[in-house]
Amino acid sequence: MTIMFNKHSVVPPGGEPTRERVRFSNLEAGYRGRPVLRQLSGSVPALAMTALVGPNGSGKSTLLGVLAGVIHATAGQLRYAEGRPPAFVPQRGAVGDALPLTARQTVEMGRWNERGLWRPLTRRDRTVVDSAMERLGVADLAARQLGELSGGQRQRVLIAQSLAQRSDLLLLDEPTTGLDPEARERITVLLTDLVAEGTTVVQATHDLEAARSADACLLLRDGRLVGQGPPEEVLTPTALSRLWRPA
């Protein structure tokens, strides 16, 4: 796979150029010989909220993993506009309960990209961690073990870790799945605020209400892109019925 860092713009009919934060072309990826992404081509607009929508197994998590750099694509091109490396928040189930880490230690891991694993945190690093924990409302959980936290608390700690990376590209895999309404609303408001502050946010979601409130939508089925654009144009009743119709 080819990875490039540059600037790309597209011009909608009758509109102004829209900057792309990420463009991917003919991506292919999978697990141990099982293909998941198949000739996937699309883009993520900068300074916007993009929702990845599709059934289980459609390739949402794999695409996020490729964009985050934690999954290697076997073919295709991936182009990033100028910016910091992406921050990735995996599904809650991907983070084990038995990890012997406190909430604060988990958030501090967000500084490893800049400091390295063995170098001590600087005063600035600690300030960044404090700020991220305060923003997510988890400062009072600093000394608690990760495995002791509720689902909503743990998810906020993981998002705080991503904020500690100070990235302008945030990738989240089902960030509100399984959370109570209050926790979902809190995270939704935070992500909206981050976009307003200049962060590009991409989230995989089964929540059609959340997808409809996004700025852009990528519709996936069987590892292929079957729709891309504004949610009101992509998430039509016909498209959604086809999406979950048995193959």
What are these regions (language model features)?
Residues L170-E174:
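Catalytic Walker B motif of ABC-type/P-loop ATPase nucleotide-binding domains
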Residues A214-P230:
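H-loop (His-switch) and adjacent beta-strand-loop-beta switch element
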Residues R123-L141:
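Conserved ABC ATPase "signature" region
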Residues P181-A183:
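Helix N-cap at the start of a conserved alpha-helix in ABC-type nucleotide-binding domains
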Residues Q145-L149, Q153:
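Conserved ABC ATPase signature
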Residues A68:
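Helix-to-loop junction immediately C-terminal to a conserved catalytic motif
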Residues V53-P55:
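The feature captures the beta-strand-to-loop junction immediately N-terminal to the Walker
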